Amino acid sequence: MIEIENVSFYYQGNEQMGAVNHLSLSIPKGQVVVLCGESGCGKTTVTRLMNGLIPNFYKGDLTGAVRVNGRDITKMPLYEIAENTGSVFQNPRSQFFNVDTDSELSFACENLGYPKDEIVARVRETVKDFKIERLLGKSLFHLSGGEKQMIACASVCVTAPDVMILDEPSSNLDVRHISILAKIIQKWKAQGKTVIISEHRLYYLTHIADRFVCLAKGKKVFDLSADELRKQDMEKLSALGLRTPDIRCLEPEPAGAAGKQSLCFEKFRFSYKRQKECLQLENFCVPKNEIIAIIGNNGAAKSTFGRCLCGIEKAGMMRDGDMTLLYKERLKQCYMVMQDVNHQLFTESVMDELLISMKNPDEQQALEILAQLGLSEYAKRHPMSLSGGEKQRVAIATALASDREYVVMDEPTSGLDYKHMKEVALCLKQLKELGKSVFVITHDVELIYHCCTYVVHIEAGKVINQYAIDKSTHTLLRDYFLLQ
């Protein structure tokens, strides 16, 4: 039993950041509860209250009571919380203690003093459940974002805690691993574990979760069962920042005629040090000035293709009409929003991030871009003080400010609610209207339906399918996301 009784919390040094206001919530043992709501509504703060990170790590002004099995969590020793509660953070990289997957999977058991034979058995069973055998023996630095997310989920599962707290666990997962995650959550539920999931993607949880608790500005808006959620008006849910509970209802937006010009990629072959070739694209073309969705499973080399396209990795050539662009030219004309935006935010304020991205810094134009993405109030904030979804939008704002000809966005809607996903979709459409070619590496089917016009499907470093999105092909796209 987890009880949150009239709790309010404000982070130290920032009274507006992730505040929870007079929140009361009771979660009986064995329930699966989804915390939902728009970015910055307080979901992550609630998870930190439940796992003791507040106030042990995140300091601030806390009132009210948080109890786990009748005990005040603020008075429980950390080792006891760690034994009973497993947490997966919004950014899995921030919870890794090792440099390789095997050590990370066994670390929690070693830390709790389990015998070696038991550790080996627990890791083996967890690896089998998560179907991550191919990730064993690998460097964490060489994994894709989705692969890191699976290792993070598996590493906390190894100790079999009674309470599992997951913060955006599907944000970087492909459709296959979302299905695996859903089955694991079902298994936890059958075992009587209490599972709390902070999530924007709701469709994979509607047949598992007991309750959906929606927050807005740190307060509870509703507490509904899955059946009650499905009966809600979609416009009402969208206004609260919620994604669709049923992706079968999605329809593509009417697409205009594709342009006659093409972008062609030749000899895009690449391998990381001491590894076999992961990208093997000999020759393929896509229409120019379109929004192109790059889809495929985690580890398919989608991000590697994006890095090669931008010239970050030295591979192949791109032809745009009569122009041949080698990697040095592509570095000048391409802009990439990385999968982990923490790698590319390094100034003292959000405004400065946009200004250094511009050829000719223009504060008024920067303010207009921030307003377009709902970031005006954060102009003077330090980027690292923002939530994961807010950082994501700042990185997208820098892409708009850069005015480059070719834009690559790697999981641009990771951790974003419905409202902000739509804002990103509008920005991508704006880039298209300005004559830019946009490549979107994504697992977000809702984003694809809102703005993308063409699909390139990559698996094992090769293009296995490509097509324009229209009424004749949208079932092909939808079935890929439903049937994996």
What name fits each language-model region?
Residues 153-154, 396:
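Hydrophobic anchor residue at the start of the ABC signature
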Residues 59-71, 314-331:
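Conserved ABC transporter NBD signature motif
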Residues 219-241, 462-483:
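Conserved beta-strand-loop-alpha-helix hinge in the C-terminal portion
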Residues 118-135, 363-378:
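Conserved ABC ATPase "signature" region
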Residues 139-143, 147, 382-386, 390:
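Conserved ABC ATPase signature
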Residues 164-167, 407-410:
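Catalytic Walker B motif of ABC-type/P-loop ATPase nucleotide-binding domains
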Residues 199-200, 442-443:
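H-loop/switch region of ABC-family ATPase nucleotide-binding domains
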